[in-house]
Curated annotation (Swiss-Prot):
This is Histone H2A. Pfam families: Histone, Histone_H2A_C. The nucleosome is a histone octamer containing two molecules each of H2A, H2B, H3 and H4 assembled in one H3-H4 heterotetramer and two H2A-H2B heterodimers. The octamer wraps approximately 147 bp of DNA. GO terms for cellular component: nucleosome; nucleus. Residues 1-23 are annotated as: Disordered. Gene3D superfamilies: Histone, subunit A. Its main location: nucleus. PANTHER family: HISTONE H2A (PTHR23430). Core component of nucleosome. Nucleosomes wrap and compact DNA into chromatin, limiting DNA accessibility to the cellular machineries which require DNA as a template. Histones thereby play a central role in transcription regulation, DNA repair, DNA replication and chromosomal stability. DNA accessibility is regulated via a complex set of post-translational modifications of histones, also called histone code, and nucleosome remodeling. Belongs to the histone H2A family. It is found in: Nucleus; Chromosome. It comes from Acropora formosa.
Amino acid sequence: MSGRGKGKAQGTKSKSRSSRAGLQFPVGRIHRLLRKGNYAERVGAGAPVYMAAVLEYLSAEILELAGNAARDNKKSRIIPRHLQLAVRNDEELNKLLAGVTIAQGGVLPNIQAVLLPKKTEKKQH
């Protein structure tokens, strides 16, 4: 460094990378975890921002569907059962989380068509 320039102005406040990117998820923490996790020798500046955005989007999507499931069950609090219903009823999320077990999630209500009672036609006289 040659020492040129005035550096940072005295009155300016530091701005987090999350707020710069317009995200709620912590970009700095994700960057640290990527560096410490030995995933690669070096981590680019854009990688943690992109990853934080993806994680935030997926979280928002699941919470939106789980909130709808809670409302359908006339509950105001999301429980693991609502998360399970949200994920398993959504085709893409179910594919993404196919190998994931949600604790206390239960199972989807499903009765095989063969086991359902036969529909008999009423005879008209």
